[in-house]
């Protein structure tokens, strides 16, 4: 069986609220760590989210 190209990742808020999004990424085309600016409802503003592993 072939290895899956898409993997699940966790995008953790840099505002230190503990809020996170779970999304997928293609591990072949996106080899570096993903960062996105998204809304953090606990901080009530848009902040940067950085990729971490799902445990």
From Swiss-Prot:
It comes from the Bacteria. Keywords: Ribonucleoprotein, Ribosomal protein. Pfam families: Ribosomal_L33. GO terms for biological process: translation. GO terms for cellular component: cytosolic large ribosomal subunit. The keyword Ribosomal protein applies. PROSITE patterns: RIBOSOMAL_L33. Belongs to the bacterial ribosomal protein bL33 family. NCBIfam families: PRK00595.1, rpmG_bact. This is Large ribosomal subunit protein bL33.
